[in-house]
Structure formats: structure tokens, C-alpha cells
């Protein structure tokens, strides 16, 4: 599908697939409970796990982050460019719903450099949820055709290539820098 069609689907609180730095992600409007519920059902993902949020600029992630708990050094980590995509687990605002944070009082966020994410966020005006586009037990999709093979020929997928990263993002804690998932 073309960018404009994917943007319309996102604005209608539908789940779409889009390319990220290494693999295709499944995403939706994180402010829509119904959209997130559709995503969780599609992925067969327990709500307790929480979701990653991606955007091309920090402004779109700030509504989810408890800024009062972060120091300048944390902001530097969050906004720095890395060799591999890096998702940071940061304190969530109390207003962030549990369908985003899961069982945690934190939220996982990533500034994504992929042009597709930038265009989608710019045109929708919101960050996107991001979980790898794959059915349980199958590897994450690296092409639009793989997405269609797993989710059906008519699943809304943005026809663009993934970035050059080899692995999905590394996930780290902003305070301890503990690695939850290697990139």
C-alpha cells in the first residue's frame, strides 16, 4: 500500500505493518485502546508485556514519559544516535494506560531513524506502537511480501524496504543501562 493509505488506516485506529530499521513492525495509534486491543489479538501478545512506542522526534514520545524523573544524562542517552537501534525503558506518566505499559510503571520508547516511521508519524501526528511483524513462532518479517504471507494478502503493509540494521532494536533500561534484549 501507499503511504497515504497506511496513514488513513492508522487514523481509523487500524493495525498496519511498516518497515523499521531491521524488520517490519506492526503498529497502531497508541492512544486508541481499540487499536491496541486489535494489535494484541493479532499478535497473540499478552497485554502484561507492554509495547514499544516509536517516533521520529521526541515531541511525540513526551506524552508518555515522566519527564520529572529524568536527568540531563538520561535525555542524552535517549536522543543519541547509536550503531544499532536502541529502545529505552523510561518512567511512564501515570496517565499512560496499562494497555501500553503492561504490568510495568515504565514505557519502552525509541527514536526511529527510518524514513517510513518519520513519514507516518509526521502525517498522523502521533507515535506508533511497534512490535515485530510475525506470528507466534515465526521469524520477524523483513519484506512486505513476508508480511502478506503471514498476515494475509490484504493486510495493510507499507511497501518500503527495512533499514540496514541486522537485528531488531536493543532494549535497555535508562537508569541502570541493563540490556533486556541485545540488538
Swiss-Prot record:
Annotated family: Belongs to the SUA5 family. TsaC subfamily.
GO cellular component terms, semicolon-separated: cytoplasm
PROSITE patterns: YRDC
Encoding gene (name): tsaC
Keywords: ATP-binding, Cytoplasm, Nucleotide-binding, Nucleotidyltransferase, Transferase, tRNA processing
Catalytic reaction annotation: L-threonine + hydrogencarbonate + ATP = L-threonylcarbamoyladenylate + diphosphate + H2O
Function: Required for the formation of a threonylcarbamoyl group on adenosine at position 37 (t(6)A37) in tRNAs that read codons beginning with adenine. Catalyzes the conversion of L-threonine, HCO(3)(-)/CO(2) and ATP to give threonylcarbamoyl-AMP (TC-AMP) as the acyladenylate intermediate, with the release of diphosphate.
EC class (word): transferase
Domain YrdC-like: 1-183
Organism: Mannheimia succiniciproducens (strain KCTC 0769BP / MBEL55E)
Protein's UniProt name: Threonylcarbamoyl-AMP synthase
Amino acid at each position: 500500500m501507499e503511504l497515504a493509505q497506511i496513514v488513513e488506516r492508522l487514523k481509523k485506529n487500524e493495525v498496519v505493518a511498516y518497515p523499521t530499521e531491521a524488520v517490519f513492525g506492526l503498529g497502531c495509534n497508541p492512544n486508541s485502546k481499540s487499536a491496541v486491543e486489535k494489535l494484541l489479538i493479532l499478535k497473540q501478545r499478552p497485554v502484561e508485556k507492554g509495547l514499544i512506542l516509536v517516533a521520529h522526534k521526541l515531541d511525540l514520545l513526551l506524552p508518555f514519559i515522566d519527564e520529572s524523573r529524568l536527568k540531563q544524562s538520561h535525555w542524552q542517552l535517549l536522543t543519541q544516535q547509536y550503531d544499532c537501534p536502541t529502545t529505552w525503558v523510561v518512567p511512564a506518566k501515570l496517565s499512560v494506560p496499562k494497555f501500553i505499559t503492561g504490568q510495568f510503571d515504565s514505557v519502552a520508547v525509541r527514536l526511529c531513524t527510518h524514513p517510513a516511521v518519520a513519514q507516518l508519524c509526521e502525517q498522523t501526528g502521533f507515535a506508533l506502537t511497534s512490535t515485530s511483524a510475525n506470528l507466534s513462532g515465526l521469524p520477524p518479517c523483513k519484506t512486505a511480501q513476508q508480511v502478506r504471507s503471514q498476515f494475509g494478502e490484504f493486510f495493510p503493509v507499507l511497501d518500503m524496504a527495512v533499514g540496514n540494521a541486522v537485528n531488531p532494536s536493543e532494549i535497555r533500561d535508562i537508569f541502570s543501562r541493563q540490556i533486556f534484549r541485545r540488538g
